[in-house]
A protein has these predicted regions:
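Glycine-rich phosphate-binding loops that contact phosphosugars or nucleotide phosphates
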Residues: 37, 42-48, 52-116
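An N-terminal, well-structured beta->alpha segment
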Residues: 2-41
Length: 116
């Protein structure tokens, strides 16, 4: 019975998250999706730690559905890989805390070249 309860708990949590998304999605959601759909460059995902794993999966999913994308590890980015990002790209930075220094340190460069 323990496995069934776990499945019910996890499924309930996921359903609640979807309900929350439906309730809270607004103009920001529409704007973000529109930017990605109309991107003339690549969609680049960036993160460190567990956020890096999520970014890799997102990049692979986007690429498999026809959206040019790739992942850049934020630590590697600040040590030379930022040159892969172009002004026509959209860069999605992923951080659980929002304060990961490696990720935060990339923001200035990304803005300077005009990437969104």
């Amino acid at each position: 019975m323990g496995y069934l309860k776990t499945m019910v708990d996890v499924t309930t949590t996921e359903m609640n998250a979807i309900r929350c998304l439906i309730d809270e999605a607004g103009i920001e959601y529409e704007s973000i999706v529109s930017e990605i759909a109309n991107c003339e460059g690549k969609v680049i995902f960036m993160g460190v730690g567990k956020s890096a794993h999520i970014g890799k999966k997102l990049a692979a999913t986007f690429a498999s559905t026809g959206t040019p994308s790739f992942f850049v590890h934020a630590t590697e980015a600040v040590h030379g890989d930022l040159g892969m990002i172009e002004s026509k790209d959209i860069t999605i930075l992923i951080s659980n805390s929002g304060n990961s220094m490696e990720v935060v340190n990339c923001i200035k460069y990304i803005k300077a070249i005009g990437s969104k």
